[in-house]
Amino acid sequence: MRQESGDASLLRKLNSAAILRILRGGEVVTLTELARAARVSRPTAEGIVEDLLAKQWAEECAEEPGDRQRGRPARRFRFHGTAGHVIGVDVGGYKLLSMTADLNGEILATRKVAVSPELPAAERLKAIVALVEESIVDSRKLAAVAVGTTGVVDEAGRVVKSVAIPEWTGVELQAELARRIPVPVLVENDMRLAVLAEHWRGVAKGYRDVVYLFTGNRIGLGLLIGGALHRGSHAASGEIGDQSSGYRLAFRNVIDYAMTVDPGELRSPGQSAEFAVARAREGDETAAQAVEAFALRLAEGLVTIVNPLDPELVVVGGGLSQAGPLLVEPIQRHLNRVTLYPPEVVASRLGGDSVALGAVRLALDHLDRTLFTATA
């Protein structure tokens, strides 16, 4: 008898998970449609939906004008996307950026704070927590926080090594934030989150093998292989580090140009590149040459990634993706000349928001796993 009871309980949980996944797809559905899609009886579907309504994971939709027919109108349901919120945070050397989203991934608020690469680790932690607290739309609804950070991040959320922010090396980031934030906290490498965002809502949607090239105040890579994020055996996949002279020297031409034209202004590498791009768009031939030299340096480095990995797509992302054809076209021409199977090269439309948006997706994925496990 206990075995029968246990089997029935397990079956109900499996059916609940199936119905919740259907609702999670975003469509408005009737009980009949739910029952058919989940392959359960209509009474079973109705009982599960009532339970999901009580737990606020589902909501009943109002009847739309023109729906009324003879008899009782069909009840219609959808996933209750506003029942909770998640926050995605991009921790960079020069900025902290947060995005608050509902469970459907709709962005509710965005906040940005400028920081210095030399900021001590303890102060950076405080700034992250303060940003999260400021980003909370409704404290009762906050369900998870995900953080993307530069550097090698292991499975425990520890920053094993960070070239861009040396002070960050060795910080137990997930553990430190979990002590200060009262909801589940996830930590991942920023470049992996950037390519995740592109695959979710960017130019890489529908692609399975993608190289994401980050261009900002530094250079980084994110890899999607076979439709999955590639972390590597030491979670160091995509790290350029300080051994790649080609990438370290990539900024030299745009920095030299900016210092020559406007020597009184102190700029970061990314700001120097942005300055050169802006001047190139205005018709400055010297600026255009500096930007093309920058693009070719990037392309030379990409060759060593593209030939062995054979991706379908290269996404040029980060703050400098706004350069568009000024970066993309020289890179595409070089890859066309020297790679076995040249991938398409495109500029990201997400710009500097990709890491925070990828963190939102990571938090939502965590909630989905938790929710379906609890249901099933």
Where would I find each of the regions flagged by the language model?
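Phosphate-binding/catalytic loop of phosphoryl-transfer enzymes
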Residues: 89, 103, 141-148, 152-249, ...
